[in-house]
Amino acid sequence: YRRQRQMCIRDRRRASLMVKRLFDIVVASIMLAVLALPMLIIAILIKCDSRGPVFFRQERVTQYGRIFKIYKFRTMVVNANELGASVTVDNDRRITRMGKLLRKIRADEFPQLFNILAGDMTLVGTRPEVPEYVKQYSKEMYATLLLPAGLTSRTSIAYKDEDKILGNAANPDKAYVEEVLPAKMKYNLEALRKFGFAEDCRVLWDTFESVVGSERLSVTK
């Protein structure tokens, strides 16, 4: 009986992963079609605003520890990694004028829709970390690499103002590894236990509300 139950759970999880992948492809394709013109305008504005490429590419870690190149719209000056911490802090001088706007409305993440279509990422899942931070994972944290890295998650919503938290730290990189990362992983590990299509839909809706809600608040202020 136990073996049959395990096989049933495994088959159910496999089916959930197939539905998740199909959902990723459909939604990412629709979003890219809708955002094609806005993304073109953003690309032009980035080139007009500061010197450097339109896209920022960086090595990140996804499912089973595989390294991939993540794509974002560039929001910082060229060689920003050589000018400061690996993480971004509040009022970071490396961020460009256009970059501040893109980060505020999360539009810098749009190019990751291509990562999703390529199968490197999923719509909802643990945000991908750089290899140097993954090396700091505890054994429990490695469980988050059982699924593809995500565009958004409960953690992303809870820590959308992460840069402000790190802005008060004397050593942002150290504060991230020792304080922020373990706290974020609690959300990520809990998300693994709640894994399912319905939960993914709720996270996507909550992400939309979080971004739109923060914009309404800033307009009101």
What residue ranges belong to the model's regions?
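Single conserved hydrophobic/aromatic residue that forms the stacking wall/gate
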Residues: Y1-D11
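Juxtamembrane loop-helix boundary motifs flanking transmembrane segments in multi-pass membrane proteins
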Residues: R10, R14-M18, D90-R94, E109, ...
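Polar-ligand-bearing catalytic/cofactor-coordination segments
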Residues: M98
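Short acidic-aromatic low-complexity motifs
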Residues: R103-Q112
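Active-site His/Glu-centered metal-binding helix of metallohydrolases
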Residues: C8, L22, V26, L117
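Short, glycine-rich, amphipathic interfacial segments at transmembrane boundaries or analogous
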Residues: F56-R94, T155-P182, K186
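Hydrophobic structural segments characteristic of membrane proteins
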Residues: P53, F114-K221
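A hydrophobic, helix-centered structural microdomain
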Residues: R13-V78, A191-K221
